Amino acid sequence: MWLCPLALTLTLMAASGAACEVKDICVGSPGIPGTPGSHGLPGRDGRDGVKGDPGPPGPMGPPGDMPCFPGNDGLPGAPGIPGECGEKGEPGERGPPGLPAHLDEELQATLHDFRHQILQTRGALSLQESILAIGGKVFSTNGQSATFDAIQEACARAGGHIAVPRSPEENEAIASFVKKYNTYAYVGLTEGPSPGDFRYSDGTPVNYTNWYPGEPAGRGTEQCVEMYTDGRWNDRNCLYNRLTICEF
């Protein structure tokens, strides 16, 4: 039975003109493809490829649980542009009541006394010779002699006026200068329109006198008053030079 395929094969070979020798391999035309075989086993992993480009940023993650420490203060910025004026505010609350008026008056009186004392001291020191304070007055002399009018001018320049006693204590204070310099001194009295009527420089009548017995005796010819070394008074011509004594 196997002789039939062999005879068929020989017949095909003879028809195609192919020579066949017993000792050589005959090459025929390709046969019909067979059915695909089953998949083989997976191969081994290949080598790492080249590093790719960075991908886009991912979405922001949730806040962390650990707080961060604040950083250092930055440099001060440049001054900003002045802003517009704001609206007028509401009136403030009423302040506490001020001091009573009488306290202010007392303060003014105290300041006036201080000012007066300063002027007294400044004027007395300007004479720079002898100073004596009696009550609210300061008597001072520069030790120089002059006429009545010249003494008035000198005392006025120093901020005072020619000394005039208005009490026994003040008379004794002026007399102490007269005794010290052993000379007479004018006091601030002048004769009025009537002979023997002596008054203060402001024109008011004299309320204290210490005349030497029999004085005043000039009867209108001696219109000033001088003090002796014992403190007694005598009317005298105003052109004589007498010790300069001022009061402040």
Curated annotation (Swiss-Prot):
Residue ranges occupied by any C-type lectin domain in the UniProt entry: 134-247
Disulfide topology: C155-C246, C224-C238
Feature: compositional bias, Basic and acidic residues: 42-51
Domain Collagen-like: 31-100
GO cellular component: collagen trimer; extracellular space; multivesicular body
InterPro entries: C-type_lectin-like (IPR001304), C-type_lectin-like/link_sf (IPR016186), C-type_lectin_CS (IPR018378), CLec_Tetranectin-domain (IPR051663), Collectin_CTLD (IPR033990), CTDL_fold (IPR016187)
Transmembrane annotation, as ranges: none
Main location as per UniProt: secreted
GO biological process, one term: respiratory gaseous exchange by respiratory system
Biased segments, Pro residues type: 54-65
Glycosites: N207
Subunit text: Oligomeric complex of 6 set of homotrimers.
Full protein name: Pulmonary surfactant-associated protein A
Annotated organism of origin: Macaca mulatta (Rhesus macaque)
